[in-house]
């Protein structure tokens, strides 16, 4: 099971110190911090609450409120890539991995559509990515990103503690490119 993943933890030692990007470099995040989303994400801002990770009464937000470790996240991503593995029914996984909104969604830029599970690659050439059509990806505002590529039989989890770089900055792209370069030999 996913023994280290929940919507809160009782042990602050389980948490990394959160940071956010600034032109001067990463800055330590504080309670109530408002940070503008990158322009490519249609603007707006995020109100951060690092303390929510220690609050069992906080709203259980899957987009900005889960805590967990790399092993658990990889186990979940692998289950999605390989058809459910007893965590989800295969029909549910098929829905998560199907394009419900086409490339017009462009949540990750050109070439990306959207399924129930996140951004779904519908045109690798337009996206300028080494990933294959059918790759599913998503991330979280506190600085994580993950993707799986069913054709390459590959799952990748990137856990950082820096918003928004770890979610949608150059770092996840550099990791992606390094992984695919290594696969090419």
For each predicted feature, which ranges?
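Short, surface-exposed loop or secondary-structure junction motifs
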Residues: 1-130
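Short acidic-glycine loop/turn motifs at beta-strand connectors
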Residues: 11, 150-152
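Short, surface-exposed charged micro-motifs
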Residues: 117, 145-147
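Short, hydrophobic/aromatic-rich segments at coil-to-beta transitions
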Residues: 130-136
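Short, well-ordered beta-strand elements
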Residues: 146, 153-161
